[in-house]
Each structure stands twice: as structure tokens, then as C-alpha cells.
């Protein structure tokens, strides 16, 4: 691809703010972003807020926050479709002036009767064109007209789709669609075409549930004499069983994945592989995605969402993340989880240092940030330590007596460090003719309240001398 073509690429992500940024929308945004970034182009963001009753500020904020969290930046200012209504009306009037549109005075009752008749006769064209060639002087009083496109009655409308291939519709099946409602508000179909044209969009990449819209919009482009942008309609995301994606399958907002402890880098990697492939490669850095992504490599069949695969991929990203970056992500996710505020209140320079020290071990056994938080709970626990059922079963009277002797042995360790406490524990086990595991298990239960944790020598080093000895004293029997 030459620089003369790549520099002019413009994609757009155009969500409707009637709900949060769902997982399918996030993938659409990612595909638009990758295609533009890989070709030195721009990705624009347009909020399609023409449905005034359902559009909410909260949904707009959630969409913007979701994109920022996924690190999908857009170029220029956010464009709000509703603010451009005057321009949309201007284009509708332009089509009237050229004879490519007409005023329709059909009443609501007449339209209902038309639809019922068409359905009874098995026709997909529901509007019968009653005002298409009728003299406006015959207009009934008190009826505010709509403006309809004078769509071709014969022939076919064709779109060369980069994913779906050549798609053809018979014009006899397509209505004279409404461009401007009786109240003067533009329809979605008109607004999208005008906005894409005025924004200089060269490539429309969206879900294949919009494929029928492509036929309608192509007719509007043709009526205006405008160049039709390249179209790519990507398959939807289905559940693991091939059915429509539901909430239990993963049809959640991006904010939910954030609150479940997924990393944005992992979610991006997972989403790019939903429907797109590049050989057998599964793990992609952002740079690799940008370089490799192309539209013809997107499959036509629906992708299947797999939570287990996402979780495993997230675990990979956690294990390979920088410890300091994981601490930052750890802090961030506390804003979105139950009891996160209480844990955040305990974060200070000392606990951050402990968390950073524990991270190499914690991240090896965590697939999500929530598991990371759970694994780090021993750092933030208050004395007396809460003991879970499995740990309590280990803390028998004999074990508590052993902990009392361990407390005495460890009290003599100076200076306190992982190697020093390890040497002391090994010496204690040998002197008492015990295996190290027999010492480590009750020790772990007393120090963390659990039966799983980072290595016991690491735990002692992370907690430090005073906290370690204090917790042992709480569980010991002298």
C-alpha cells in the first residue's frame, strides 16, 4: 500500500449511548483503531445520540471511560450526532431540490394499513409509494410530512464488502426510506451518511447486524452523488455454544471486565483474535497487532466467546507484566470492586513496598487482578488474623505449641531477611527431627490465615520482623 493511500485512511467508531460499551462494541472500536493506526490514518469517535429518549450522559461517560481504559485513543474532538441535526436537514432539503426525495403525507393509519397489506401479500417493501409521484397540492390538512428517499424501483443495489464479499439487494424489496421525520428530526440512516461524508470517513468497519443498513445508505450516497466509503461488516460474537451472546456468556460492558480484574492489554489481545487470525499466533503485543491487522483476514462466521481462554490469556499477561505496573493496576481496580475502598485505605508507602516485594510470587498463581488481590490479602490483614477453615484445621493444639517454639527461634534472628529466616527454620526443623513441610504448613496458617501463599520465607520477609512475630504470638501456645 503506498503512502498516498495510507495517509488518507479515516475510520470511525460510532456507538449509540443507550448503554455501556459492550464487548462487541469494544472489538469494533479495536478493529477500527488497529486499521487506522497500522496505515498512518485516523480513527474518529462519533456518539450517535439521535435517540434522545434512550441516550444518557452516564452511557456516554461509560463509553469514553471504556475506550480510555482499553487505551484506544481517537483523533480530534468527539462528534455528537444530534448537534449536527441542522446539517442533516439541509441535506434532506438538497435531495428534495434535486428530485431525489419527496414529501410523504401518509397518515399513521394509512402506513399501518400498507404494512399489513404488504405482509399479507409476502412483500418486503412495506411502503407502497403513494406520495412518490403525487401532487403535493393534494396534501391533507394538519399532516406534517416526512421526507422520503426516491429509491430506485428496479435493478439492484450492490456493496463490495471487504469481509462479506459482494452483497446484492434487489431494489424492488427496498422501501423509499424516511430521511426526515414529520417533526423535522433526521433519521439514523440519513445522519450516518451525512456524518461519514462530512468527517471524511474512508472505511466503515462495523458489526454485520448493520449489513442491511449498508444497502439503504448506499442508495443515499448514490442519490447525493457522493463516494461510498469502503465497507467491512464484521461477524457478531456468539456464546460458546453458538447461540446469541448473553450476559452469562460474556455480553457485559467493558466496565464489568475491568471490575473482574482483566488487564486492558489482555482484553485487547483476546478481542483481536475474536474473528481475526494471523497464522497460529495467539499472543500479540500492541505493536504486533497494529502491524499485522488487516480486514481480509477477518472470518465471515460468528466468533465464539470463551471465558476460560480469556482468563488463561489474562494470566499470561499478569505473569509477564512488570511488578510496578501490576501494583498500579492493583490500585486502579480497587476503585471498581466490593470492599475496594477499605483495602485502598490501607495502601501506603510501606504496604506498597510489601506488595511490590510479594508480586513476583503472587503473579505466578493469579489469572486475574481479583485473584491477585485475594493472594495479597495477608499483607493487609489486621491482627488478630482471620483464619479460614482449612488453615484452622492445621492449627491443632500440637501445632500451636510448635508455633510457640518457632516464635522463640525466630525472635533470635538478626538481621531479619528471607535467607536468615530460612536458615533459622531449617535449623529448627533439623533440631526437632521434623521435615521442613511439617514446620512450614502451620507457620503459613498462622502468618497468612490460609494454606496457600507465596513461599513461607518470602512471607516472613514481606511481613517483616514485628508483624511476623506478632502473628505467631497470636496463634501460639507457650
UniProtKB/Swiss-Prot annotation:
| Gene Ontology CC: one annotated term | cytosol
Q: Position of motif 'KMSKS' region? A: 244-248
Q: State where ATP binds.
A: 247
First-tier enzyme category under EC: ligase
Q: Give the GO terms filed under biological process for this record.
A: glutamyl-tRNA aminoacylation
**Where in the cell?**
Cytoplasm
Q: Could you confirm whether the keyword Transport appears in this record? A: no
The main location is cytoplasm
Sorted alphabetically, which Pfam families does this protein's record hold? Anticodon_2, tRNA-synt_1c
Q: Which reaction does it catalyse?
A: tRNA(Glu) + L-glutamate + ATP = L-glutamyl-tRNA(Glu) + AMP + diphosphate
User: Recorded GO terms, molecular function?
Assistant: ATP binding; glutamate-tRNA ligase activity; tRNA binding; zinc ion binding
The record, for Gene3D superfamilies, names:
1.10.10.350, HUPs (3.40.50.620)
Q: Where is this motif: 'HIGH' region?
A: 15-25
Give the matching PANTHER family: GLUTAMATE--TRNA LIGASE, GLUTAMATE--TRNA LIGASE, MITOCHONDRIAL-RELATED
Q: What does this protein do?
A: Catalyzes the attachment of glutamate to tRNA(Glu) in a two-step reaction: glutamate is first activated by ATP to form Glu-AMP and then transferred to the acceptor end of tRNA(Glu).
Which family does the entry's similarity section mention? Belongs to the class-I aminoacyl-tRNA synthetase family. Glutamate--tRNA ligase type 1 subfamily.
Q: Mind telling me what this protein is named?
A: Glutamate--tRNA ligase
